[in-house]
Amino acid sequence: EFDTVYHEHLSFFNINSMEKACLMNDMVLTNVTKTDIHGTSYVFDIALFKHETDANIDDLKDCENSLYDINTYDEYSLNCIKYRNELHNALIEQKLSGKKLIGFGSTAKSNTLLNSMNISSDFFTCIIDENKLKQGKYTPGTDILVCSLDDISQEDVQDSIFVILAWNFYEEIKNKLKERFDNCIVMNIYPLFIE
């Protein structure tokens, strides 16, 4: 999920760092819950007094041990490059088959991803975003027009594929598009599939 590594998202508290922060402030970490937000995030339960800690903390900490091994980051880098190339090839394949690409979600993560692939404005017809402040503007670095869903007609959809760049909202966006447009084709970028 290299597309979520940018400016304010570069910092992430893992369990070890949260435990240290708690100790420095006379608190104790009592439980950790994993959530699916942005791939995976943690929700920490913290107490002011000594409490029993949940057994899952040790299990999750064991999973974090690889974070202190440089090979983990080398492998991560190779996986990012591999994924980026697979996605880029899938987009090129759609273009070569005659499909127009319409993106959905002009987010920081989508712009990080598109810039990493050197995508330009001739690749996408536009990128839909529901934020009115973004509509009529262009994506940074790639110069792709950001438009409203209302700018897309049923006729536009006939030879197009919607590329869901805001992959963490895939189901919601897909359902919205399928309700609005007959026979629309939707591509999820993470994981990569078309339906």
Q: What is each of the regions a protein language model found here?
A:
Residues E1-S11, I15-S17, C22:
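Short, glycine-/aromatic-enriched active-site segment of Class I SAM-dependent methyltransferases
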Residues M27-H38:
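Conserved S-adenosyl-L-methionine
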Residues G39-F44:
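Short hydrophobic/aromatic beta-strand or adjacent loop that forms the aromatic wall/cage
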